[in-house]
């Protein structure tokens, strides 16, 4: 089957890889001059199934108001009055109750755990290198309340069968030695030993080369104008005066998927702006071993080979990609507080990207009402964590196989009024934002 994939971020390239493995004739189209040039370029570097959770959670609306008056707030909202922004925010608010949170988190953990397994298989099969580490993730607490609240996270992890260990402040240095100097600032941490890290951009670039060697065709520097429709199916992709035709089409355009699909398929995907710093390591002993998450500021600090990636924050500002100095100061403050001797902040590279976020936090993977149009978008802050699983899942669906995990509640049909999801095991309450 001839397949056209729109988008060459980590999700689009992973989709191309798994579809090519199934013997399909795959073409990937992107407006950039290479893969992973936008949202996949500078993310926090985490592959963290254990922390897969929606931003829409109980208590978040009140916290958002409080954060409006904080200098280093993890979430910022700038109202522009647009219908798309207001509609998305209203949908997110409707998902901030406990019942919706439980359902949404269960979906996300299911896909994230599966995706890590797919990545592990891919790594073993191909030997792909991307400065990856299998050193786990450590969530750091600065207050006793945060430490006590970890019991809720532990209940969720128990339900999902995710290994963990709860550490006191004195024990943190056993897994992150550089924290010994700052342990007095912390109350403890929650460690997930099965989480991984890696350079998402490097992974995507190398997987794209492998996919190309497997027969995938990449067309860069082409801006897609619209999808052409004939009856109940897509007839082609238009750019300029050219039309490319295929048997099936996959939209993996991230935050730009919504506009491309306007008038064809309604999806609630909205850009959530994030930031990162990439810092050269000057003292390996003073740098993180793997990844730590600062629970107070929602900032992740990740170790690559000779660099530290510091990423986080969320701004609801539409498609604004301007670099804000205040956000850089927050990133510098957190990494300087926890790892003051690890790297040279003055030589850091500052980056921003637009994560494609759904109001319920779960990505949209699968079929649409148009019989040859498929979606793989809306992964929010977890595109790197969920990419391989989403790609394999989509390849299974398009190849006529039964997916290895429940997939009906990952498709866009879950937003229809008559959708009735299959029963899933309930989760205890846990909040990703406190």
Swiss-Prot record:
GO CC annotations, alphabetized: cytoplasm; plasma membrane
Keywords: FAD, Flavoprotein, Oxidoreductase
Keyword Flavoprotein: yes
Reactions it catalyzes: a D-alpha-amino acid + A + H2O = a 2-oxocarboxylate + AH2 + NH4(+)
Binding-site list for FAD: 3-17
One Pfam match: DAO
Cofactor: FAD
Enzyme class label: oxidoreductase
Functional summary from the UniProt entry: Oxidative deamination of D-amino acids.
Name used for this protein in its record: D-amino acid dehydrogenase
């Amino acid at each position: 089957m001839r397949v056209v994939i729109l988008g060459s971020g980590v999700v689009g390239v992973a989709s191309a890889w798994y579809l090519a493995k199934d013997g399909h004739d795959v073409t990937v189209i992107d407006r950039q001059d290479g893969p992973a040039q936008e949202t996949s370029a500078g993310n926090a570097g985490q592959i963290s199934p254990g922390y897969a959770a929606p931003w829409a959670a109980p208590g978040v609306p009140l916290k958002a108001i409080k954060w409006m008056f904080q200098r280093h707030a993890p979430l910022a909202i700038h109202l522009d009055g647009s219908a798309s922004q207001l509609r998305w925010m209203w949908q997110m608010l409707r998902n901030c109750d406990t019942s919706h949170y439980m359902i949404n988190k269960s979906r996300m953990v299911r896909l994230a755990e599966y995706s890590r397994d797919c990545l592990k298989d891919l790594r073993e099969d191909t030997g792909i290198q991307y400065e990856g580490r299998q050193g786990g993730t450590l969530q750091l607490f600065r207050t006793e309340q945060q430490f006590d609240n970890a019991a809720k996270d532990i209940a969720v992890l128990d339900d999902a069968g995710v290994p963990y260990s709860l550490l006191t402040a004195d024990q943190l240095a056993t897994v992150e030695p550089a924290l010994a100097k700052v342990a007095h600032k912390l109350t403890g941490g929650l460690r997930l030993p099965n989480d991984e890290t890696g350079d998402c951009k490097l992974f995507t670039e190398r997987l794209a080369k492998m996919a190309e060697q497997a027969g995938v065709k990449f067309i860069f520097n082409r801006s897609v104008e619209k999808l052409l429709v004939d009856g109940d199916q897509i007839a082609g992709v238009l750019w300029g005066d050219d039309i490319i035709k295929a048997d099936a089409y996959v939209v993996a355009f991230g935050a730009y998927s919504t506009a491309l699909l306007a008038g064809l398929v309604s999806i609630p995907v909205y850009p959530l702006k994030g930031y990162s710093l990439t810092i050269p390591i000057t003292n390996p002993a003073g740098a993180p071993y793997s990844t730590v998450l600062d629970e107070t500021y929602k900032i992740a600090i990740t170790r690559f080979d000779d660099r530290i990636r510091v990423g986080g924050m969320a701004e609801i500002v539409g498609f604004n990609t301007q670099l804000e100095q205040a956000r850089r100061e927050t990133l510098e403050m957190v990494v300087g507080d926890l790892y003051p001797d690890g790297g040279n902040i003055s030589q850091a590279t500052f980056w921003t990207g637009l994560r494609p976020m759904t109001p319920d936090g779960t990505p949209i993977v699968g079929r649409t009402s148009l019989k040859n149009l498929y979606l793989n978008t809306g992964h929010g802050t977890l595109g790197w964590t969920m990419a391989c699983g989403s790609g394999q899942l989509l390849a299974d669906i398009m190849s006529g196989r039964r997916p290895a995990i429940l997939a009906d509640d990952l498709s866009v049909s879950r937003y229809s009024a008559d959708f009735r999801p299959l029963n899933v095991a309930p989760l205890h309450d846990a909040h990703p934002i406190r």
